[in-house]
Curated annotation (Swiss-Prot):
Highest taxon, organism lineage: Viruses
Location(s), subcellular: Host nucleus; Host cytoplasm
InterPro entries: RNA-dir_pol_NSvirus (IPR007099), RNA_pol_PB1_influenza (IPR001407)
GO CC list: host cell cytoplasm; host cell nucleus
GO molecular function: nucleotide binding; RNA binding; RNA-directed RNA polymerase activity
Main subcellular location of this protein, as a coarse class: host cell
Protein name listed in UniProt: RNA-directed RNA polymerase catalytic subunit
The organism's taxonomic lineage, starting at the top: Viruses, Riboviria, Orthornavirae, Negarnaviricota, Polyploviricotina
Region (Promoter-binding site): 249-256
Amino acid sequence: MDVNPTLLFLKVPAQNAISTTFPYTGDPPYSHGTGTGYTMDTVNRTHQYSERGRWTKNTETGAPQLNPIDGPLPKDNEPSGYAQTDCVLEAMAFLEESHPGIFENSCIETMEVVQQTRVDKLTQGRQTYDWTLNRNQPAATALANTIEVFRSNDLIANESGRLIDFLKDVMESMDREEVEITTHFQRKRRVRDNVTKKMVTQRTIGKKKHKLDKRSYLIRALTLNTMTKDAERGKLKRRAIATPGMQIRGFVYFVETLARSICEKLEQSGLPVGGNEKKAKLANVVRKMMTNSQDTEISFTITGDNTKWNENQNPRMFLAMITYITRNQPEWFRNILSIAPIMFSNKMARLGKGYMFESKSMKLRTQIPAEMLANIDLKYFNDSTKKKIEKIRPLLIDGTASLSPGMMMGMFNMLSTVLGVSILNLGQKRYTKTTYWWDGLQSSDDFALIVNAPNYAGIQAGVDRFYRTCKLLGINMSKKKSYINRTGTFEFTSFFYRYGFVANFSMELPSFGVSGVNESADMSIGVTVIKNNMINNDLGPATAQMALQLFIKDYRYTYRCHRGDTQIQTRRSFEIKKLWDQTRSKAGLLVSDGGPNLYNIRNLHIPEVCLKWELMDEDYQGRLCNPLNPFVSHKEIESVNNAVMMPAHGPAKNMEYDAVATTHSWVPKRNRSILNTSQRGILEDEQMYQRCCNLFEKFFPSSSYRRPVGISSMVEAMVSRARIDARIDFESGRIKKEEFSEIMKTCSTIEDLRRQK
């Protein structure tokens, strides 16, 4: 039967059908090759938006820098970064006037955080630019390398374990005339394999010491590495994102902590909350504007889009904001918060890997690294690349480009939201002093603006005033991409509002299906996703039931675990049939062992093992969950695990699911190919950290784990803990005298070894 799809929508308001227009089925586009071109685009664009600013030279690194602050205001609609300091400060003052004590209180909260934060805060996060090796590394490794280098250069404040002390080392390192680092390199040699008698290339990893002078070190400390943003849907062009090094990260973290604290107190801020809480916040603002506009006023909403938000922001403006926000605070606190914007005003963008060239005729491929772009003959490049390189050349130093204006993506989301909200705050009648007034929502670069006025002319005047106010603060509302509607219908951060929020179900599509963790986790994650969407996203019972059946089918095909009585032949079917035949209670078999599916939409909250436990044969229970069975996962499984969900928009979300340790919760082994690369040393370091942390956790089980007070090393803490525990166990008769004295002897030996070291 043919169905005309338009018939489906006859009774559905357009907003409710919005899901069908989103590009979220199928694989998202990924980037290949280098991000060098995209990064050059970003650098060139940023300078173009600020081109009428003042040029200066950085005295330490010699990098040319463009400062657009208080520059000439644009005459036309072009995006520009000429924020006016006095306007920004005034907007901050008005924000404080409307929210008495907001800055003061946020500063006090932040000061507490600053004094308590441990340096391990910086291990969170994925890829981080590791300045010691000049490339990206996992955050924990990059931090470890930084601390290792600091200590070998007699920078030891970080040993207290407090982030603020680590940052003292960072500050001091920038005053050093030279910094000695350890670099990894590879040696290759041909040797004969004893077993196969073939010649093989053996790689050994060497470490060598290397001195950086002050200028080179500063360039590295101020460098942001760039990559291409992957998996962006609905765009034809890719774009560059930045990952900062460890020197910058700690300072940014404190600034964002302060800004987050302010955002939490602002009703127009879409950050830091998310999900249903965010929707409630938005609905409140809409309700306020609707109720006040009953008979006398009309109300319109702009679904806003800003042109190149990041590239027109300016770190110098953020410095002005911070200086104002912290103006009555102690000197040390003001200093530590002002460093991040100062570093960003002097930042360098690493251009990535460079360009790949291939000659079809000669079957040759060669890479031109970014460092060579400064002086290579441009005849090899096509016209558009030639223009890019010519433009960026004056800014290049050692393969990095000086990029003073602009912010890179995602660095100061909270602080830039405060800036945006300060403009929304100016819409109150006591500030506009006329018949129109506005309010709205701001979440990083996304905004919705609600304008109320007695007539259309008033609405137009209000929008114009908002537009011009934004320009004064370096924010460029795009007239082409923003659209206006009667209040009651708008979109904000991919939430569609039509007298209430409609579910945008397509955003959740990527998280349906089999995750590929292991049989146990995948079953749990799959049903939890369906459950969550029934709660949050209008997934109705019939559709949910269908989603569940599709999921089970998908799961069985993924793990080749069709029911024991099926005709489908797979590699596992022989074993599964054997198990099926010898099982008395077949309903008790897990789906991954060829059992039937007992899930329906009423019991999605129960882990499968629990759901079927009473139905299982006793010997099957014994094999499945026996702690003595070597195949039962012995990772200490918490009762709640976290899966990382990649929604269509925004950052990866953490999703909790129930976990039961069984023979199906296996952990795959690491791919061996890494063991032959220069990453091997890093891998060994990582394993060492892992072992140390595991050992530490054995001494301090999480229930009794208090952050160490005072300054003691992990070893000292463990030794003193061992002594206390041993004494308690000995006195209560849990251990014998010989064991007690052996423990004490071991503790003393460890301390002696530490002293000798």
